[in-house]
Structures are given as C-alpha cells and as structure tokens.
C-alpha cells in the first residue's frame, strides 16, 4: 500500500497464506511468507517470488516466521505428532538446520536484536529463549497466574515486552518487561484491558487496542507517567485483530478494523503526543 495515496497492489498469488508468517526483509526490498508448506521470498520491485524451502513429509508448519536482523536467515517451526523443531534457514541456498528440538509445539520465533538468540512461544503458557547453536534453551520466568498475550523484543534487544493476562478476570491486563540476562521480570503498567500491544522506536510509549466492548478504543500509554491517552474507537468485531503499530518514526499509528463493514487499515497521527524517533 502507498500510504500517501492509499493505492494497493497485489504482491503474491498465495493460496494458503499464513498471515502470521509475513515478514519484511531488513532492507525493505522484499518479504517472506508461508504459502501452505512452502516458504517463499518475494521482491517488492519486480513482484516476483520464488520458493526457498518446503516443509518435509511427516512435519507440518508451526505458526509464525521471522527474519534475522541481517536478512541472511529465516526462523520457523516444524511440528510432528511427537515433537517440534526450530529451524534456521539460509535464504541464499535454502538450506535449513535444526536449532533445537522440543517436546511441545513451538511457535512465533523472533530473533533477538544484536544477539544470536531466539525468543519463541509455548502457546499462551510460556516464553523460551535459545541460542542459535541450540545451547542454553530455557523457559523464561515470566509472571505467574495468567497467560501471555503479545510478546516481542524491545527495539534495543535488552528486554522482552509482553502482555500478562491474569487468570482472575477482575484484575487488569498488564504490560510487563522481562530481562533475560538478569532473569528478572517486572510490571511496567496496567492497561485498559489491551488485546494487543505495540511500542514506539525507543519503547517509551506503548499502543494498544482495548478488548472492552463498552470502550473499544485505541490508546497510547506513556511509560514514565504510566498514563493512558485515548486516540479513537476501533469498534472492530475482533479486538485481537486490530494489531495497532507505530510507524518507524513514531509519528503515526496504524491499525485494522471492520467497523465500516469490511476490513480496512486506519491511520492516526500522534506527532503532538509522541516525540519522533529515528526511522
């Protein structure tokens, strides 16, 4: 989509697109996605794509995929009835190696910025961290008495930011921060029942979509003040699909909603409230 004109163009003919696997390359010139069992790499200029890898027989694809920061490799899970394995795929030659094999379905691997480590999920139960060489595979000690919502690396790669959803429905959903190198976990702020979470370029401001049916809002939360500011209503039938994100310079927020009858992308300017960050 051209953000100035709103004009869209089709990038792929994928028949079994896994939207959770769609990821831009670090140079912004291409993208990867899973089309059924096939991992494909596309070029944004030529609109051509090629198959890089296919999931072998006896395995199925786990949810999610991502690129390493240097754009050399991609990360994804292959799942069998007995186990799952985290795969590191060299994009140039299409050769895959197994980072680690685990006895549960792994998903949504994310490379750690500036470090040879991978964050991945065990459903909504737990977050795990492992080195690229398969060593030090460990479960992170996140908050208890609840499940894990959105989780991602802070832009500097030092901490993991995530939503903690308490088992007790009378308690508020909270943004928490885990520091793997110190094995510490702390609450950043409670929220107006965020369904999903994003942050700006330096993680000083968060954006979320409320799951509260009576207050279906897009909000930003200032980290230092721990204060929320309402931006607009998303009125989406599925608040978990809203997925608000900041632009690279932190001056705009984009989100999706079906509030006008069909799924569309919306933009809100926040330059009056949020300082510009390096794009």
Segments the model singles out, each with a brief description of its role:
Residues 28, 70-71, 114-115, 157, ...:
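Conserved loop/turn motif of beta-propeller repeat scaffolds
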Residues 30-31, 74-75, 118, 159-161, ...:
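Hydrophobic beta-strand positions that form the internal "hydrophobic ladder"
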Residues 2-18, 41-61, 89-107, 129-149, ...:
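Multi-bladed beta-propeller domains
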Residues 37-42, 82-88, 124-129, 168-176, ...:
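Structural motif
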Residues 34, 77, 121, 163, ...:
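Residue-level marker for isolated small/hydroxyl-bearing positions within beta-strands
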Residues 167-173, 187-225:
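Loop/turn-rich, solvent-exposed surfaces of beta-rich toroidal or solenoidal domains
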Residues 241-279:
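Blade-level signature of beta-propeller repeat domains, shared across WD40, Kelch, NHL, RCC1
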């Amino acid at each position: 989509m051209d953000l100035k004109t709103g004009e869209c163009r089709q990038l792929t003919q994928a028949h079994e697109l896994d939207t959770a696997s769609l990821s831009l390359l670090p140079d912004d010139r291409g993208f990867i996605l899973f089309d059924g069992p096939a991992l494909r790499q596309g070029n944004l200029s030529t609109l051509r794509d090629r198959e890089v890898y296919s999931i072998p027989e006896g395995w199925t694809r786990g949810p999610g995929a991502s690129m390493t920061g240097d754009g050399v490799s991609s990360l994804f899970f292959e799942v069998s009835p007995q186990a799952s394995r985290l795969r590191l795929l060299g994009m140039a030659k299409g050769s895959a190696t197994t980072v680690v094999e685990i006895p549960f379905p792994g998903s949504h691997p994310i490379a750690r910025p500036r470090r040879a480590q991978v964050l991945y999920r065990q459903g909504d139960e737990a977050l795990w961290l492992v080195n690229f060489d398969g060593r030090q595979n460990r479960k992170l000690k996140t908050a208890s008495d609840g499940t894990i919502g959105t989780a991602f690396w802070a832009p500097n790669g030092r901490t993991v930011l995530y939503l903690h959803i308490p088992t007790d429905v009378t308690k508020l959903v909270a943004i928490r921060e885990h520091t793997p190198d110190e094995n510490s976990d702390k609450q950043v702020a409670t929220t107006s029942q965020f369904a999903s979470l994003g942050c700006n370029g330096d993680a000083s401001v968060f954006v979320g979509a409320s799951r509260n049916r009576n207050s279906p809002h897009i909000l930003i939360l200032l980290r230092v003040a721990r204060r929320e500011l309402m931006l607009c209503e998303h009125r989406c039938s599925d608040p978990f699909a809203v997925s608000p994100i900041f632009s690279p310079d932190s001056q705009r927020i984009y989100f999706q909603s079906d509030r006008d009858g069909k799924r569309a992308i919306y933009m809100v300017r926040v330059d009056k409230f949020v300082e510009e960050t390096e794009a």
